[in-house]
Amino acid sequence: MRKIYATGKRKTAIAKVWLTPGKGELSINEQSLNQWLGGHEAIKMKVMQPLLLTKQEQSVDIKAMVFGGGYSAQAEALRHGISKALNAYDIAFRAILKPKGLLTRDSRVVERKKYGKRKARRSPQFSKR
């Protein structure tokens, strides 16, 4: 029985994922998926997407530690980590996951604030007179 480790990232969220063959148990920050989410169905589907696409929701156990960012970024980091772990588990899953963009790191992050501006691009109000 081998244990596969993968890391998923999104914005400032980082997910460390361990995947082992098992009965379909999902543990995030030592809580079940429903406890961790608090009933957000859309976010739950986002996390479960790679498992549902590869039909592995009942045959692998996943233990994950997620930190940084908000719930949505954490869920997407978790999805990225699970996808990378499934790819390492069976290379045949790559043909399913790659076209859906689940193995690609979403590199969009918040643009930094510049001096002389109110935000990253928002300038102070301009007055001609």
Swiss-Prot record:
<dbReference type="Pfam" id="PF00380">
    <property type="entry name" value="Ribosomal_S9"/>
</dbReference>
<dbReference type="InterPro" id="IPR023035">
    <property type="entry name" value="Ribosomal_uS9_bac/plastid"/>
</dbReference>
<dbReference type="GO" id="GO:0006412">
    <property type="term" value="P:translation"/>
</dbReference>
<comment type="similarity">
    <text>Belongs to the universal ribosomal protein uS9 family.</text>
</comment>
<keyword id="KW-0689">Ribosomal protein</keyword>
<dbReference type="GO" id="GO:0003723">
    <property type="term" value="F:RNA binding"/>
</dbReference>
<protein>
    <recommendedName>
        <fullName>Small ribosomal subunit protein uS9</fullName>
    </recommendedName>
</protein>
<dbReference type="GO" id="GO:0003735">
    <property type="term" value="F:structural constituent of ribosome"/>
</dbReference>
<dbReference type="InterPro" id="IPR000754">
    <property type="entry name" value="Ribosomal_uS9"/>
</dbReference>
<dbReference type="InterPro" id="IPR020574">
    <property type="entry name" value="Ribosomal_uS9_CS"/>
</dbReference>
<dbReference type="GO" id="GO:0022627">
    <property type="term" value="C:cytosolic small ribosomal subunit"/>
</dbReference>
<dbReference type="InterPro" id="IPR020568">
    <property type="entry name" value="Ribosomal_Su5_D2-typ_SF"/>
</dbReference>
<dbReference type="InterPro" id="IPR014721">
    <property type="entry name" value="Ribsml_uS5_D2-typ_fold_subgr"/>
</dbReference>
<keyword id="KW-0687">Ribonucleoprotein</keyword>
